[in-house]
Amino acid sequence: MFGIITLSSCIHLPPNNKHAEIHAIIDKANAEFYLDQRIWYQDVHAEINGQTILLTGEAFYSIPVKGIARKLKQAGFKFEFIDSVHYLPETFPDDLAYGIISEPYVMGRYKPVGHKQEGTEMLWGEPVRLIREKGDYLQVQSAIGYLGYIPKDALRRVKLEEWNRYHVGEQAIFTKNVTLENGLIILMGTRLPYLGNDLLLLADGNELQLSPDHYKLIDPANNPLRQEILNSAEQYLDLPYVWGGRSAEGVDCSGLVMQSYALNNIYLPRDSDEIANVGRMVGYPGWMEAMLPGDILFFAGSRRMITHTAIYMGEGKVIHSLGKGVQIQSINPDDPDYSSSLERS
């Protein structure tokens, strides 16, 4: 739940300043905060005016921006830092910050126009998050996390409450192409919310009764594998935190996640930032309604983009390996076992 931070092109320094050192710090920050620009946007710049560094550009979250300022301060640059970064997503009128794809399929492009800018297709009924408006296009984030520009008329704008109906709950995934009476073709691979009794929620908000011969049902919440992953993770409770550990003698955060999944025949990469590039995006800060027990959380820090990972247990609880070892804590500030260290991550 990522891209390169560019911070050097707008810096203008007097000759007596350590220009090369600043560029080296920025280059290092670029490498540390890099993840996958297909699902993350960050383009931050700096301008120097006397003893003030103005941070500008665009970003999803403030933590990496604060991290850059922190690195420069630690290097001895005693400037005043002003954060003027434009944070995404933009604010949309009437809280219509979400959308449902209303075309049989539409290509999401890395730029609104141009050759070889194709990212990934989005299918009819797919829920997307609106990121920004640019002329006749909207930049959106698809259900699998990809960013892409699509024409404005390729989706129906909705509020969060309606969007959740398409993102959360039992789904019907079409196993063949289906042509409706109105001529609309639902393509194989399309997912629509299943309301029960062969009733589907269509992309336009209407409902349709359709024989299950055309689709199969999937219900992520009732997958027994989720509880089995949690059971495996709980076998590590109270083990010490060991950097690089993945044995019964101790584990680090990604070692716990990796092994809990491996015990259930799911093999993940070793490190947290690698795991973050696997699977489907199911939540982001400020919206976690779709998260289910067994999902993986990632935490950002000011030193680099992904600094910690944990397994979600439901109701705000996570199991993770941190300083005191493997433990169950809460990410809800109102809970007695709330971990403020996770809030700072």
Predicted regions and their residues:
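Structural motif
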Residues: 126, 190, 294-295
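Gly/Ser-centered flexible loop/linker motifs
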Residues: 16-50, 106
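Boundary regions of SH3-family modules and the immediately adjacent low-complexity/disordered segments
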Residues: 70-92, 113, 141-239
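Aromatic- and glycine-rich peptidoglycan recognition patches
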Residues: 157, 216, 283-287, 307, ...
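Catalytic cysteine-centered active-site loop
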Residues: 241-255, 259-291
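Short glycine/threonine-rich beta-strand-turn micro-motifs
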Residues: 42-72, 137
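SH3/SH3-like (including bacterial SH3b) beta-barrel domains
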Residues: 41-45, 112-124, 179-188
